[in-house]
């Protein structure tokens, strides 16, 4: 089949996700052509998706790696970008939320999330109402944040072409740590909170700015699948105990 052959060729240099998106458009066109009598059969459903499964980029750093990175960042406090990385690791805030920080959004040992800067839009509104929140900081992190001189546009951090993940990759490589993206720092913060039995899921949901608890629960199961397996085992043990 010619269409399948073309899809196979395309998939050699594209991810499975991208190939699937292209194939869906082709199927829609073929279905339209069939519906208007331009094709004898609607063979689009027979065409299969190929392509490479992309490696997950937003991986969480291990607790050990998190400690190494945090200790380095607390020492290397002259670089504005590294302070931003420390803030992301410390708060779990999204990149856009940190770029949206202004001096008036900083309180003693805390920051207020009120805006979000995006590379694709001039709209600085937050994703949801729950995204509007107050995040506590350790005093040493707060002092480093206060050392940054605000920019002429009123914000604390320079978007710097939105290349934070690239710069982070180079920093992690230099420190010999696993490579992740800026969003991976948010995942790392969340994983650290999830690992503590003393911190409630409600608090974590509020700190991450999730729209509801279910979003946080789904996030939890994605980040820590081994916990789900353990809970499955605990649930079965509990049910078995009822018959003893």
Positions of the model-derived regions?
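Active-site/catalytic core of tyrosine-dependent DNA strand-transfer enzymes
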Residues: 138-178
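Basic, Lys/Arg- and aromatic-enriched nucleic-acid-binding interface segment
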Residues: 16, 20-22, 35-41, 45-95, ...
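C-terminal catalytic core of tyrosine-transesterase DNA break-rejoin enzymes
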Residues: 17, 35, 86, 90, ...
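Conserved tyrosine-mediated DNA breakage-rejoining catalytic core shared by Y-recombinases
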Residues: 100-144
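Flexible coil/turn residues that form the inter-helical turn or adjacent wing/linker of helix-turn-helix
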Residues: 12, 80, 91, 178, ...
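N-terminal core-binding DNA-recognition domain of tyrosine site-specific recombinases/integrases
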Residues: 1-38, 55, 76-77, 158-163, ...
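DNA/chromatin major-groove-contacting recognition/catalytic segments
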Residues: 69-72, 123-125, 218, 222-244
């Amino acid at each position: 089949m010619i269409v399948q052959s073309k899809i196979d060729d395309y998939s050699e240099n594209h991810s499975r996700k991208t190939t699937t998106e292209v194939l869906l458009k082709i199927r829609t066109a073929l279905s339209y052509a069939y519906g208007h009598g331009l094709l004898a059969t609607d063979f689009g459903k027979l065409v299969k998706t190929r392509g490479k499964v992309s490696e997950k980029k937003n991986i969480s750093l291990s607790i050990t790696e998190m400690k190494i990175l945090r200790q380095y960042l607390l020492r290397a406090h002259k670089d504005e970008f590294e302070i931003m990385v420390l803030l992301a690791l410390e708060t779990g805030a999204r990149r856009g939320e940190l770029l949206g920080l202004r001096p008036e959004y900083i309180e003693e040992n805390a920051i207020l999330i009120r805006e979000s800067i995006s590379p694709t839009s001039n709209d600085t509104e937050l994703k949801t109402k729950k995204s509007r929140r107050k995040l506590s900081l350790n005093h040493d992190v707060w002092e480093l944040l206060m050392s940054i001189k605000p920019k002429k546009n009123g914000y604390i951090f320079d978007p710097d072409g939105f290349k934070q993940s690239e710069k982070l990759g180079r920093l992690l490589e230099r420190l010999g740590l696993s490579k992740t993206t800026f969003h991976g720092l948010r995942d790392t913060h969340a994983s650290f909170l999830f690992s503590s039995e003393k911190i409630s899921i409600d608090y974590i949901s509020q700190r991450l700015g999730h729209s509801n608890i279910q979003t946080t629960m789904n996030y939890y199961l994605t980040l820590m699948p081994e916990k789900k397996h353990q809970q499955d085992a605990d649930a079965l043990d509990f049910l078995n105990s009822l018959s003893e």
